[in-house]
Regions:
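Single, function-defining residue in the core of a domain
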Residues: 1-104, 112-119, 125-465
Length: 465
């Protein structure tokens, strides 16, 4: 019986084209090991021969980091094929890494502050219910320590800017989904960092749905002349109100927000070139405004101005756009789990971009799997646990947690099992701040993995549990 970690690792990296079947097998084994003991440092995951094998694979120049990434992207697209629509939130995040020599990576800020690391743009695949199902695409790169000052109003070609990384991620995700999930409509969700004319124009060329949060008060063409986006939206009719659940963060308590919603079709005036001085063209989108009616004292109100290629003439259609945009929070949660929560990729001590990218890709998929279990237990807790866990893993949880009235061999739901796993990881109940998070679930899974290995050994040896 294959445990869920090995089954997951095989489905994620089993088709990686690394030039040798033994390398692919090693990648699968490495991913399974990381899933059992996630950590940013190779030395904290593996020992002895396994550690040496992991380093050989990561540092082998014949093993392209792009092939490891592409395998993860294909696995994500295959998972997305189960849905008619998949949300694809995209976000950029900085990865701060220890680099005492200052020669391995680049600056985190565009202003040289001396802090080194890498940049990443990630496209996460999320089910209509809000459950992460895979990695759509990801770009990881270093900035240059020698940033050239640009003349006033001068803009380099898009290909020489970080916007190209966003465009590459959008393209890779859309093309991979188109090839492996042709019946699934990708609905990209971009925060204000994606509100750039080259990105909007590229999204319009792709056969996808998109929503982008407006970052500027763009000019809009009307029948009577030119007005600002804020003016045109402010004059549009209200469609209704919507109750929005706002999740807790480090800086924000969870709350339920009542937001008023209005929308209208607008013709954005956008430059054809990079100078911003013209010539111009008109770019037709739907603009939607969601404004919180009464926010708690001290809380930043929800106030979104969104640009989408979806038609919004009813409150039901507006609801779909707003729900889709809330999936932006999923990619932020993923980045947190990847960087410092479940996986701690920022603790990595690898010293080459290629080796780091391979390791980071494996840890990214592990973080998504942890987020998948977390959200699945909240959205569809009644799902049979056997859909996500092996029989030996379920029995290991029962043996460790000892739930009242439940014995080895009993059935359980995903909701039950994830809560039991969280208990094993030290969860103290909702009084701790809410349902179990990814860090506590991951801690419990580590203990379950060791117990499940013992259960498997006993079963294969015909021992009694």
């Amino acid at each position: 019986m294959q445990n869920s970690q090995l089954a997951w690792a095989t489905s994620t990296f089993g088709d990686a084209a690394l030039g040798d079947a033994r390398r692919t097998a090693r990648l699968v084994e490495m991913a399974a090991g990381v899933s059992e003991r996630p950590n940013g440092r190779v030395t904290q995951v593996f020992e002895g021969a396994e550690r040496e094998a992991a380093y050989r694979l990561l540092e082998n120049r014949a093993v392209a980091a792009s092939e490891v990434q592409q395998a993860a992207f294909r696995a994500g697209a295959r998972s997305a094929a189960a849905f008619n629509i998949v949300f694809v939130p995209v976000d950029q995040s900085a990865l701060g890494l220890t680099d005492r020599a200052g020669t391995h990576f680049g600056p985190l800020s565009t202003r040289n502050t001396g802090v080194s690391g890498l940049q990443a743009v990630s496209a996460l695949l999320v089910s209509p219910e809000g459950v992460p199902v895979g990695l759509g695409a990801q770009a990881i790169w270093t900035r240059s320590w020698s940033q050239r000052a640009q003349p006033h109003n001068a803009r380099p070609p898009v290909e020489e800017t970080e916007l190209q990384r966003w465009i590459d991620v959008l393209t890779t995700s859309a093309e991979t989904l188109g090839a492996l999930a042709p019946a699934t409509l990708p609905w990209f969700q971009l925060d204000r960092g994606g509100d750039a004319t080259p990105v909007l124009r590229h999204l319009a060329r792709l056969d996808v749905a998109y929503t982008v949060r407006a970052s500027s008060n763009r000019r809009v063409a009307t029948d009577t002349g030119t007005r600002s986006l804020h003016e045109v939206l402010g004059a549009s009719r209200w469609l209704g109100a919507y109750t929005l659940r706002v999740p807790a963060t480090r800086d924000r308590a969870a709350r339920t927000a009542l937001v008023d919603v209005r929308a209208c079709v607008v013709k954005l005036i956008v430059p054809l070139g990079r100078s911003g001085m013209g010539p111009f063209e008109q770019f037709t989108v739907t603009a939607l405004e969601a404004r919180e009616r009464h926010q708690p004292d001290g809380a930043e109100p929800i106030h979104w101005r969104l640009l989408t290629n979806r038609s919004v003439v009813t409150m039901a259609a507006a609801h779909d756009v707003i729900v889709g945009y809330t999936m932006r929070w999923r990619v932020e949660e993923f980045h947190l789990a990847w960087k410092s929560g479940a996986c701690g990729i920022e603790d990595s001590l690898l010293r080459s971009v290629a080796a780091f990218t391979k390791w980071a890709t494996v840890l990214a998929t592990v973080a998504i799997r942890a987020e998948h279990l977390k959200q699945l237990s909240r959205t569809t807790p009644e799902l049979p646990a056997a859909a996500e866990f092996s029989r030996d893993e379920i029995d290991a949880v029962i043996l460790l947690r000892k739930p009242k009235g439940v014995t080895v061999g009993a059935d359980a739901t995903v909701g039950q099992l994830v809560y039991w796993i969280a208990d094993i990881g030290g969860y103290t109940g909702k009084s701790s701040g809410g349902p179990p998070g990814v860090r506590i679930i991951t801690r419990g899974l580590e203990r379950v993995a060791a117990a499940a290995a013992a259960v498997t050994a006993l079963r294969l040896g015909n021992g009694d549990l």
